[in-house]
Curated annotation (Swiss-Prot):
PROSITE patterns: RIBOSOMAL_L2. SUPFAM superfamilies: Nucleic acid-binding proteins, Translation proteins SH3-like domain. This is Large ribosomal subunit protein uL2. HAMAP family: Ribosomal_uL2_B. One of the primary rRNA binding proteins. Required for association of the 30S and 50S subunits to form the 70S ribosome, for tRNA binding and peptide bond formation. It has been suggested to have peptidyltransferase activity; this is somewhat controversial. Makes several contacts with the 16S rRNA in the 70S ribosome. Belongs to the universal ribosomal protein uL2 family. The lineage of its organism: Bacteria, Bacillati, Bacillota, Bacilli, Bacillales. Residues 258-277 have a biased composition (Basic residues). Residues 36-58, 219-277 are annotated as: Disordered. It comes from Bacillus velezensis (strain DSM 23117 / BGSC 10A6 / LMG 26770 / FZB42). Pfam families: Ribosomal_L2, Ribosomal_L2_C. One of its GO terms (molecular function) is rRNA binding. Part of the 50S ribosomal subunit. Forms a bridge to the 30S subunit in the 70S ribosome.
Length: 277
């Protein structure tokens, strides 16, 4: 993937960048792997706003992704590499020899015609998926399960990767993209390689309208709201917030306030906390 820059022909174009989509081989998704995706606008089943800054955006269809990678022993070939509007990573359509088709996250370096395999006997090759116990120490992986058979939950965004550091009993030590070292059950599966589209983080949106196309609404400062909308709101003109520390919209301390539970169940699996960024 390369970044495409634009001439400043307008204020919206000045500084704007996009992907050149050189890795994308088709713009026609596999119809059998599409599902309807209804917009919620950040509302729950009572119609109440639960997630701010969501709404509008271009109509999308959901691509059904195989995060479980449980088609053991059956080889498949990459048919296409496609854009997915629902995630930062690209996806690859796999045609298996038994006729089934599935989408997977497209790892870096995968191309049309590449053969992939899942299962304990699969080779250590980019795109293959194996239980962590079968993956050598030092291997770069992505799409990691937290529970065997549940499907990959960790390391799925564009450009992310994790590394297998060691094996202790029924657990495998994995260093995540954040720097956190975590113990994961050795029966959990992971895919080999780094997630592709690694320059996604370098894209400059350029204008507010492009965020609206994605369904992202504006983020308004609390200090310009009314007192009934935000703890920082109210006052005459540019008034100070009038509190000891900044507050979230729900009255909780923010900007440095720790939000993780003090007795989180997953603490026993974390060997080293993530690096401060």
């Amino acid at each position: 993937m390369a970044i495409k820059k634009y001439k400043p022909t307008s204020n919206g174009r000045r500084g704007m960048t996009t992907s050149d989509f050189a890795e994308i081989t088709t713009d026609q998704p596999e119809k059998s792997l599409l599902a309807p995706l209804h917009k919620k606008g950040g509302r729950n089943n009572q119609g109440k706003l639960t997630v701010r800054h969501q709404g509008g955006g271009h109509k999308r269809q959901y691509r059904v992704i195989d995060f479980k990678r449980d088609k053991d022993g059956i080889p498949g070939r990459v048919a296409t590499v496609e854009y997915d509007p629902n995630r930062s990573a690209n996806i690859a359509l796999i045609n298996y020899v038994d006729g089934e088709k599935r989408y997977i996250l497209a790892p870096k370096g995968i191309q049309v015609g590449t053969e992939i395999m899942s299962g304990p006997e699969a080779d250590i090759k980019v795109g293959n998926a194996l239980p962590l116990i079968n993956i050598p120490v030092g291997t770069v992986v992505h799409n990691i399960e937290l529970k065997p058979g549940k499907g990959g939950q960790l390391v799925r965004s564009a450009g992310t990767s994790a590394q297998v550091l060691g094996k202790e009993g029924k657990y495998v030590l994995v260093r995540l993209n954040s720097g956190e070292v975590r113990m994961i059950l050795s029966a959990c599966r992971a895919s080999i390689g780094q997630v592709g589209n690694e320059q996604h983080e370098l894209i400059n949106v350029g204008k507010a309208g492009r965020s609206r196309w994605k369904g992202i609404r504006p983020t308004v400062r609390g200090s310009v709201m009314n007192p009934n909308d935000h703890p920082h709101g109210g006052g005459e003109g540019r008034a100070p917030i009038g509190r000891k520390s900044p507050m979230s919209p729900w009255g909780k301390p923010t900007l440095g306030f720790k939000t993780r539970k003090k007795k989180n169940k997953s603490d026993k699996f974390i060997v080293r906390r993530r690096k401060n960024k």
